[in-house]
Design a protein with these regions (language model features):
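Small beta-barrel nucleic-acid-binding modules, primarily SNase/OB-fold domains
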Residues: 1-164
Length: 164
């Protein structure tokens, strides 16, 4: 490939990446209020169903292995999130909507990013199909054998595919 063509191609790719980062219109307002935990990565807040952005927690019925024994990792992720929230108000910043119409958002309780907390505890994986934001937290959890990383498991995406 000629140098000019390569530079043009790189410029086009860079511009496309930049365009993907620009907002596509009016941003949705924040969603704030008490949260009901639906599962390890889904909340109900102010009458809205919210999927946490950039994380993928085990499915509610998913089993993992820890210490050679089955572990209800999906149920534990849900309960741990419920315990963290403990009725405190959640503030969610919408990022997108998913194919089911749910708001996809970054949410926090008292300044604690829920996605970072879940991934750092090893209760969810960084969902790199959508964001690399939580990869450092996943690396930390892996390094320290936290949660999922203390045994063996199918990623939630693999588990969903296997259930079809």
């Amino acid at each position: 490939m000629k140098r000019g063509s390569l530079i043009g191609l790189l410029l086009a790719v860079a511009l496309a990446a930049l365009a993907a980062l620009l907002p596509g219109g009016e941003a949705e307002p924040p969603v704030i209020g008490p949260a009901q935990v639906v599962d390890g990565d889904t909340l109900g807040v102010a009458g809205q169903r919210i999927r946490l952005h950039g994380v993928d927690a085990p499915e509610a019925n998913q089993l993992c292995e820890r210490g050679g024994q089955p572990w209800r990792c999906g149920a534990d992720a849900t309960e741990a999130l419920r315990g963290l929230l403990a009725g405190r108000p959640v503030a969610c910043t919408p990022v997108d909507r998913d194919r089911f119409g749910r708001i996809v958002a970054r949410c926090a309780v008292e300044g604690q990013d829920l996605g970072a907390w879940l991934v750092g505890q090893g209760l969810a994986v960084a969902y790199t199909d959508y964001s690399w934001r939580y990869v450092p937290a996943e690396f930390w959890a892996r390094w320290h054998g936290r949660g999922l990383w203390g045994g063996s498991f199918q990623t939630p995406a693999e588990h969903r595919r296997a259930q079809r």
